[in-house]
Regions:
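Hydrophobic alpha-helical transmembrane segments of multi-pass integral membrane proteins
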Residues: 1-177
């Protein structure tokens, strides 16, 4: 348990997933990946990816609540999990025949889930490895997290023919290139 100080005074941060479901998301994801490799065109992999979606969203339902959920690094981790759930849902629906772009699910998983999770880890590790507290988060980190989240949202929109030129701009702004 970590205790928050400063402008965000609240109860100790506690995240306790239900013991029986602690590894369900990872297990269902591994089962889906194995079935997608062995029987890629089978309906089994479609149903397993939907089971992985349910497990990821179940884990997200037990996320931090209250004021700690509004901290940038916690919100980015939650958004990454939300993108993972949405990506698995779209991937499963596409495999079951729903008329969705086939790249929308993988883009939600890669750009959304992975991008937001990596940004959160960079924020946390960057502060911890330089000996600073998480309350010492500068405006640049908040801005980079916001741009990463916006880029993840905008990356999926071109699949539905909207805002196709905005994604590269938002992806380049956090790095300054």
């Amino acid at each position: 348990m970590a205790k928050q100080e400063g402008w965000l005074r609240c109860k100790p941060l506690v995240y306790r997933p239900h013991p029986g479901r602690r590894h369900a998301a990872a297990a269902m994801t591994v089962l889906y990946m194995a079935s997608a490799l062995v029987v890629p065109d089978s309906g089994v992999s479609a149903w397993l990816v939907l089971a992985a979606d349910a497990a990821v969203l179940d884990r997200l339902a037990e996320w931090f609540i209250g004021q700690p959920a509004f901290k940038t690094e916690v919100a980015m981790l939650a958004l990454g999990n939300a993108f993972a759930g949405a990506g698995f849902l779209v991937l499963g629906a596409t495999r079951l025949g729903l008329d969705l772009p086939p790249v929308a699910g993988p883009h939600m998983l890669s750009v959304g889930a992975l991008g937001c999770a990596v940004m959160a880890v960079l924020i946390i590790a960057g502060l911890r490895h330089t000996g600073r507290d998480l309350l010492d988060l500068r405006w640049q980190a908040h801005g980079a997290a916001l741009l990463m989240a916006a880029a993840a949202f905008v990356r999926v929109l071109p699949e539905i023919a909207f805002a196709s030129g905005l994604a590269p701009l938002l992806w380049s702004l956090p790095t300054g290139r």
